[in-house]
Each structure stands twice: as C-alpha cells, then as structure tokens.
Amino acid sequence: MSTITEYFESLRGKSIAVIGMGVSNTPLIRMLLRADLKVTVCDKSPRERVEEQAAELESLGAKFQLGPDYLSKLYKFDVVFRTPGVSPNHPELVKAAEKGSPITSEMELFFQLCPCKILGVTGSDGKTTTTTLISEFLKEAGYNVYVGGNIGKPLLPDVAGMVPEDMVVVELSSFQLMTMKQSPNVSVFTNLSPNHLDYHHTMEEYTAAKLNIFTHQQAGDRAVFNYDNDITRSLSRQAPAGMMLFSRRNKLEEGVYLRDNAIWLTNDMGSREVLPLADIRIPGVHNIENYMAAIAAVDGLVPDKCVRAVAQRFTGVEHRIELVRELNGVKYYNDSIGTSPTRTMACLDSFDQKLILIAGGYDKGVPFTQLGVEMTKKVKTLVLCGATAPAIRKAVEEAPGFAESGLEIVETSNLAAAVAAAQAAAVPGDVVVLSPACAAFDQFKNFMERGKVFKELVNAL
C-alpha cells in the first residue's frame, strides 16, 4: 500500500481527467492540483452554472472541458477519474479504456490507500440506516470512526491522517461498485430488488455491480447477507471469505436471528441474546433487519452493551419515517428516502392503520405491480404527483381487490398541491406519509431536498 504522496508522485507528468465537480470529486481535484499535477475537469454543466466553483479550481491551475461534449476527448488523457453518475459503459469511457487510459474513481483510490479496516454497506434498501448504526456501534466502543461514501463527506482528504487502529464505514451504491477492484474487510448486503434500471438497464447488470462489495475479499474478511431475500441468500454462496447470515423470519443455526422478542447471534463461540427489540426506538420491521445486519457486521469488534446503548438513544436518520409534526390530531411523516417500491412497502408495514400516502416522482423504470397490491390493503387515500403518477395509478387500479378497498386516488401537479390535498383528506387520528416509491429527480435535486421541502410545507400548514 502506497501513501497518497507516493501515488501523486506516480502521476507526475501525466494528463489527468476528472469527470464531474460533485461532492466527492471536488476535494480530489483540489488535492491533485495542490500536488502540482495536470488536471482537466470534465463536466456537463455550462461555465455560467458552475462559475464560482470553476474560478476557484482555475486559480489552482485546473483546465476545463464543459458542456454537452464534456466527455468527447477522454481518450487523450493518461488517467481518468470517473464520477459514479457516469456509467463505465459510456461509449467515451469505453473508448478511453480501449486506448489504454486507466479508469478509476475517488472511492477506488481511497480503498487503495486506506491503512485501516473498512466496513462497507450496499443493497437496494436500508443502506444509510445500517451504515449509521455500524458507525454508532463502533464509536460507542471507543474507535475513531470515519463515515463516508454515499453519506458523510469524501474520505480521501482524511486518508493521510488515518492509522491502522481507526475504522472506516462506507455506504456504497451500485454506481460506485461497478468498477471496484477491492472489497471492504467487512461487507454488508442488506437486500436486493429491482432499482436504478434507468442506469443499469438490466437487473443482471445491477446485481453484477453489487457483487463487487465482497468479490475481492481476502482470508479473514467477512460478508453479511440477508437470508430472507432470495437474491442475497443465493449470492451468499459466492462469498470467498467468512460469511454471516441474518434473518428476521427464520431461526438460523448460525448467524443473527429473532428469538423471544430479541435479536440473537449464534457463532462458533455459542449463542447469545444481543438486543431486546424493546430497546429499538425506530419503527418498522425493516429497521429490525437493519439492526440485525449491523450487529452481524460488528460481531467481534463491539461489545453487546454498546449495541444496547446505541439502540436506546438512536431515533433514526433524517427522511426515514421521520415524524415532522402532529396537527389537529393528524401525524405527518417524512419518508422521502422511499425512492423504490420496496422501500415504500416497508414504510407501509411500519404502521398499524391505513395511511394517507403521498407518492410519485422520477421514473427509474421499476415496476409498481406489487406496490399497487399493498396500497389497496394499507392506504385509504393515495395522493399522486410527479412523472410516475399515471403508472402508479394504473398499478393500483389493476390490483386485485381495488374495487372493494375504498381507496381514493387524487392526482396533483406538485408536492405543495399534494400536501394540501392530503391535509384536506385527513381527519383526527389519520397519518399522512410522504413515501414516493420513486426518485426525486423529476422535480428536485435529490430525495433530501424533496424531504426538506415536504417538511417546510407541513410546518407551514
């Protein structure tokens, strides 16, 4: 393992392209420029949209390739740093690779240089909560913990100060994993269901990307899989190193499971109760699964008393079944992280009454058939907005039992109108939930902005 200084020295005299000026790549660009390396920033935004950021990087020596043709000359560079948002299968990246340019990324470089243990989490749902729980468990046990990937901040600027005794916890998306050539020391696969098919095109490509979280593991490493998910249970047989399963529905001979209203763990040291379910403060059976995954990840690293201490105070992550307020006897919840049908179904399962649900958003090419069935059972009023509103409506109206369900469907033009419609439909005792089952890109920058706007709208009622 080289140091970051040695790595930068190996790039001296080479032409470097960095695709994108996003959250993870901008610190990388600064580091490369401060090492006096030749960097060209390639970004699809026109100069006027990124003027302030571009001016700062230009003052450090950056050159730019901006606008719609920002990828057109990648093949001329000696090294290309990819942004997760651009697929490695993009024709211009393929062309650059064929010409001999190494294609890498900020996260791949971090893995290459990191001196300490890395725990990584991927899956279709539950990544952020599981990542957060793992990091909180480790902090409670006294470790110096760095959190990054899809959450937290870019880790590369901190790598020079890390020591072998530290811990790194990263949330990894399929976009990041596609080209990874190293796996975390502990990898967690929460579950897998159709998602991001607008990017990956097929479920097979999506699954193949996710596999990199454990494919490159070495002896002594561990991979954690969800036994209750058909795909991850099958993938667990491919784990090249240590493996641990968790299951909410089945008692396992070895692994993490439920028994007597508590989470238990059985390994070669025996069986023990780790966490009473009564200690968990966040709602939903899916969050029990998130706890199980995190407990499996830290087994042997964190005493059980630390797990219990975290559970007794942890109230969840923003935008995940987050109570916004109670107004006139009606509770309003923000579950903007519900960016897929499976997430929204998990949200519906977290309540013991029929909901007023606000759903719809950007179309990722994911089917809504099963969600439609669940909505007829668990939703009293469905308020739709966004690009997918017609597709969700169709799935609900074609679901068995829709005619008898009494489910009312309201279509609105935007989130503000949807909140107003939900308030109009609500009576004391009702629960209104934003859980869109879709990404936010049709009307918002991301799910966080959507959740923030929702909370502002609700607090203004």
Please state what every model-predicted region is.
Residues 43-45, 65-68, 104-108, 240-258, ...:
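Beta-strand->loop->alpha-helix junctions that form or flank phosphate-binding loops
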Residues 38-45, 223-227, 358-359, 378-387:
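Short internal beta-strands
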Residues 1-105, 109, 303, 394:
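N-terminal leader/targeting and accessory segments in enzymes
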Residues 39-43, 147, 169, 245, ...:
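Short beta-strand "acidic-cap" motif of Rossmann-like dinucleotide-binding folds
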Residues 53-55, 370-429:
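C-terminal helical cap/extension that packs against the catalytic core
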Residues 22, 45-47, 151, 228-229, ...:
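Residues in the short beta-alpha loop(s) of Rossmann-like NAD(P)-binding domains
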Residues 33-34, 71-77, 84-227, 231-242, ...:
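Phosphate-binding loop of NTP-binding sites
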Residues 3-15, 25-35, 275-380:
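Nucleotide phosphate-binding/pyrophosphate-handling subdomain across enzymes
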